[in-house]
Amino acid sequence: MATYKEIKGFNIKSLSTDPSTPLEGEIWFNSTSGTLKVAPLVVPVWASGGTNPYTAYDACGFGTPTAAVICCGNSPPQIDTANEYNGTSFSPTTAYPSPQSGADGDGPQTAGLVAGGYSGGYLTLNCDYNGTAWSVNPVMNAARSGLGLLGNTAAQTAAIAVSGEGPSAPVTTSTSDYDGSSWTAGAAVPTWKQGTSAGGTTSAGIAMGGTAPIATNSLIYNGSSWSAGPTMNSPHQSAGGGGLATAAVCFGGTTAGSNAATEDYDGSSWGSAGNMATAVSNCHGKATIDGPTAFVATGSDGSAPARTDVSQVRGGFLVETQTVTTS
């Protein structure tokens, strides 16, 4: 015969004080106050991140919401300016080796990689950042702009540049693999994507959005080949995004004007996740290695001139521990 515990589940823990690091949704009885409590939930929300030192669109960036680098972009003209962000304010750092726009970046603030872009022509330039200065790497095997770059924390030694556009064709389905010393041709993506975003690692990656042919699609990488991924809920052309293949975020872009929609990916499907504080497109000036948290600075907000110095942070909003009542 089944026991009561087998039928009804485990007993609720009785604790004299609330746990300091409870699991989301955890329930316990506080014996001191005589109350039943449930642990807080962390809900990612967007908030203002302050004013970026310069206005631009098609900038690039990498890092986290509390330790980021935002650099370059079309101001116009194209610029080489770079700034660090500490979660509160910006400070200048060493300029990027060449003015450009349309590149993408990935990695932590002290070990980031920026690749590609456009400056009077499509670029094979790619550079490492060590937290203080830039170093130029061997050129990419293919010039591209409007690409997505993935690699996460290992970007300087294991990265993939995804799709974009280049000099040989308006758009490309090619990718480029980087091992820390050289770039080689990688597995082609099923559909070309200009202005795409990417996240994850070279063994488990994701690309999302882009200008065409379908701005709602995503692509999944398994370490050797790309395949069609789940469809997003709204189009994200020239959007921002990144994270991991099991915890990604995509935000902003162009949909008959600048888009504020945000979506989270959990490894199986995309879910609508509220709106940005300010709608922006052309927003690769972002820091997303800890997706679904994110930081984005600059972009196009649809105003004239079509560029902005706004920055936005998407972090965890802590819902306080709640007392369970009958009301």
Which sequence ranges carry the predicted segments?
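Polar, enzyme-active/binding microenvironments
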Residues: 1-327
